[in-house]
Amino acid sequence: MEFTKKFLRAKSPCADGFRWFSRNVEDGTGYQEALDTLVNAGRVEDACWLLAQFGPTSAVLAVDALEAEAIVFAGTVEVRGSIDVATVIQAGRSIRAGGGLRAGRAIVAGEDIRVSGSIISQGTLQAGGDVRADWGVEAEGGIACAGDLRAGWDVVCHGALQLKGGGFVGQDLIAHGLVECGKGLRVGGHLTGAESLRVGQGIVVGGAITGVAHLEAGWGIKAGECIHTQGAIKAGESLCAGGEICAGPGYGVYAGLNVQQETWEASAQVWSRERPEGLRSGMWLGASPLHPEIDRSRACVMPSPQ
């Protein structure tokens, strides 16, 4: 693909960007060359806009290691070692690294992001496909993923966590913003939230679920320890906790919202150490059969109000 002023004008660029492009990029310049020219001139946002307008290519950038101020590449970025970018890395297709991936402002891929180390963004993290890290994932901003999110260690998200697929976290999930997951959510350790958490399918957490505002799952919810929320707890099918199930003051606990009442005994079971206060639907059956004896020293305690 070669660029001309007429070709670019058809995309309705801003006046300042078009003037700069006209003066600094010759007609007939290649697509990636134009992106590189913009990035090298510090016009990273213009390069990202250009990529959004003209889309990805099949080109591959393959290097041993990558360290730069910014990277905007129309194809796939493949790095045998680590990627360290001061501001933005954006790829039209996938980003793959044999080590870790770090960016100071944003990490964006049109398709998958797969790394053998950790993913750290001091801004946002966005992928048009799956995000997979053998170690942990941390973003100071939001995480938006059109596929699945998989991390071997912790996932820490300081903004909204939005997954169209499922979430699979080997250790703890710490979310400071809204969490929305189109499929299931599985966490090996604890799940700590601050705002509401909604999952289209089921939730399985090895430890405790705490801090969340409203908790909602289309299927069942299972936690190895307690489930404590600030708001309501809603499960389409059964609820199971190794400790207590506690909704926020004035809110209810609901199981079996997506099944008929006649099937509650099988499909809307509620298992917890004590009958949840405010249980509005479902059938409480006692302590979880998976945790017949709970060490009270590990019991969840609601944090004191600040």
Task: Give the positions of each predicted feature.
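Short, glycine-biased loop/turn motifs at secondary-structure junctions and
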Residues: 1-306
